[in-house]
Amino acid sequence: MASWLQIPKNSPFSLANIPFGIISSAKITSPVAAVAVGDYALNLSIFASSGGFSQLPVIQPHLGVFSQPTLNAFAALGRPVHRQVREYIQSVFRADTPFPQILKDNSTLQKEALLPLSEVTNHLPMHIGDYTDFYAGLNHAYNVGVLFRGPENALQPNYKHLPVGYHGRASSVVTSGTPIRRPNGQILANPAANPKVPTFSPCKRLDIELELAAFVSKSNELGKPVSIDEAEDHIFGVVLMNDWSARDIQAWEYVPLGPFNAKNFATTITPWVVLLDALEPFRTAGLEPGNRESLLPYLREKRELNAYDIPLEVEITNAGGKPTLISRTNAKNLLYSFPQMLAHHTITGCNMNTGDLLGSGTISGKENQTQGSLLEQTNGKNPLKLADGSERLFLEDGDTVVLRGMAGTEGNYVGFGDCVGTILPALKLEF
């Protein structure tokens, strides 16, 4: 899809994408809605107030949503509106645009509304009321299960019957680039000791988790589940996510109710929300068909293809060092889709709200260096080597982690942008 705007061929934000986000800048002090196009952000607030949407009647009554500090109001308008807005913006930027007067030949509006991405500050795209993290990465679940329970009992009996999940902490979800403070907590230094007595210490086994996450658009009433056939229309779009994890804190605390402090200190997401329509060309088979007979009817999708073919990668750069690519995997390594997660989450009548976030769970392949966590790669025993020769079992202070995901071909990539976090030392606490 050719554009009159110069878009780098390797940009994750080609015209095939058009992801939505929230930005501010030196000139725009209040956060507003935007879309990313190549190396630019289009300020949708200025675009809307300057007649940019004059050829799109469906959005006329709702132009105020683009001046809000979150995308919640826009997301709540529903998928048909999202689709028309995205397609309209694509048509405005096309080389053969039917509306050249809107932006292509409007140098004044270009100067006001098109901002270099290097000059904008990204904010969380949505107000996140609740955050649920699932465990749909079958290979990750198996790999970790083998480490703790052996191959015969790696997966719990419920795993292939329902999307396992837990309620995370919405308040500590941060946007890419936010520094991550190493957590302090209770750690069992010697698991073989008897009696087992913890110590208080900075986390020594700080890890990453490579995930996708989906934002809810349409809410449902309390007591009324979202059916599997309707669930996709309740999803706004997808981001890349790093669910930072304190493995040693988790090992001591997680029985019997699961992770708590080990997961609540930070979760990083990319700031640009990629709409489901942009991902649709990459729909593919997941680890098992979405319509498999082994699922109970409320989870059984009508179609077999229930995943997206999106290459993913993990990179670590130590302080003063060079980047090291430690993992390549693919988003199709999931057992459940986001519609299945949403249908399961609401089957009890749980009401979801616009802006709620659903994490996929860690995405890993079966081969070495396709894992989405350090725990799987090193088991805390077998270090991986960085480019400068240093070794890692888990993350050290000063390490910068970058997650990336991008599908498609040169000139038409659909990607999320970088998901970045740098580890800061733990606070020194005295009691």
Swiss-Prot record:
<dbReference type="Pfam" id="PF01557">
    <property type="entry name" value="FAA_hydrolase"/>
</dbReference>
<dbReference type="GO" id="GO:1902000">
    <property type="term" value="P:homogentisate catabolic process"/>
</dbReference>
<feature type="region of interest" description="Disordered">
    <location>
        <begin position="362"/>
        <end position="382"/>
    </location>
</feature>
<keyword id="KW-0106">Calcium</keyword>
<keyword id="KW-0378">Hydrolase</keyword>
<feature type="binding site">
    <location>
        <position position="149"/>
    </location>
    <ligand>
        <name>substrate</name>
    </ligand>
</feature>
<comment type="pathway">
    <text>Amino-acid degradation; L-phenylalanine degradation; acetoacetate and fumarate from L-phenylalanine: step 6/6.</text>
</comment>
<feature type="binding site">
    <location>
        <position position="254"/>
    </location>
    <ligand>
        <name>substrate</name>
    </ligand>
</feature>
<comment type="similarity">
    <text>Belongs to the FAH family.</text>
</comment>
<dbReference type="GO" id="GO:0006559">
    <property type="term" value="P:L-phenylalanine catabolic process"/>
</dbReference>
<feature type="binding site">
    <location>
        <position position="211"/>
    </location>
    <ligand>
        <name>Ca(2+)</name>
    </ligand>
</feature>
<dbReference type="InterPro" id="IPR005959">
    <property type="entry name" value="Fumarylacetoacetase"/>
</dbReference>
<feature type="binding site">
    <location>
        <position position="133"/>
    </location>
    <ligand>
        <name>Ca(2+)</name>
    </ligand>
</feature>
<feature type="binding site">
    <location>
        <position position="209"/>
    </location>
    <ligand>
        <name>Ca(2+)</name>
    </ligand>
</feature>
<feature type="binding site">
    <location>
        <position position="362"/>
    </location>
    <ligand>
        <name>substrate</name>
    </ligand>
</feature>
<feature type="binding site">
    <location>
        <position position="267"/>
    </location>
    <ligand>
        <name>Mg(2+)</name>
    </ligand>
</feature>
<keyword id="KW-0585">Phenylalanine catabolism</keyword>
<dbReference type="Pfam" id="PF09298">
    <property type="entry name" value="FAA_hydrolase_N"/>
</dbReference>
<feature type="binding site">
    <location>
        <position position="250"/>
    </location>
    <ligand>
        <name>substrate</name>
    </ligand>
</feature>
<feature type="binding site">
    <location>
        <position position="135"/>
    </location>
    <ligand>
        <name>substrate</name>
    </ligand>
</feature>
<keyword id="KW-0460">Magnesium</keyword>
<keyword id="KW-0479">Metal-binding</keyword>
<feature type="active site" description="Proton acceptor">
    <location>
        <position position="140"/>
    </location>
</feature>
<feature type="binding site">
    <location>
        <position position="243"/>
    </location>
    <ligand>
        <name>Mg(2+)</name>
    </ligand>
</feature>
<dbReference type="InterPro" id="IPR036462">
    <property type="entry name" value="Fumarylacetoacetase_N_sf"/>
</dbReference>
<dbReference type="GO" id="GO:0004334">
    <property type="term" value="F:fumarylacetoacetase activity"/>
</dbReference>
<keyword id="KW-0828">Tyrosine catabolism</keyword>
<dbReference type="GO" id="GO:0046872">
    <property type="term" value="F:metal ion binding"/>
</dbReference>
<dbReference type="InterPro" id="IPR015377">
    <property type="entry name" value="Fumarylacetoacetase_N"/>
</dbReference>
<protein>
    <recommendedName>
        <fullName>Fumarylacetoacetase fahA</fullName>
        <ecNumber>3.7.1.2</ecNumber>
    </recommendedName>
</protein>
<dbReference type="InterPro" id="IPR036663">
    <property type="entry name" value="Fumarylacetoacetase_C_sf"/>
</dbReference>
<feature type="compositionally biased region" description="Polar residues">
    <location>
        <begin position="362"/>
        <end position="381"/>
    </location>
</feature>
<feature type="binding site">
    <location>
        <position position="263"/>
    </location>
    <ligand>
        <name>Mg(2+)</name>
    </ligand>
</feature>
<comment type="function">
    <text>Fumarylacetoacetase; part of the L-tyrosine degradation gene cluster that mediates the biosynthesis of the brownish pigment pyomelanin as an alternative melanin. The 4-hydroxyphenylpyruvate dioxygenase hppD catalyzes the conversion of 4-hydroxyphenylpyruvate to homogentisic acid (HGA). The protein hmgX is crucial for this conversion and thus, probably functions as an accessory factor to mediate specific activity of hppD. The homogentisate 1,2-dioxygenase hmgA is then involved in the cleavage of the aromatic ring of HGA and its conversion to 4-maleylacetoacetate.</text>
</comment>
<dbReference type="InterPro" id="IPR011234">
    <property type="entry name" value="Fumarylacetoacetase-like_C"/>
</dbReference>
<dbReference type="GO" id="GO:0006572">
    <property type="term" value="P:tyrosine catabolic process"/>
</dbReference>
<feature type="binding site">
    <location>
        <position position="243"/>
    </location>
    <ligand>
        <name>Ca(2+)</name>
    </ligand>
</feature>
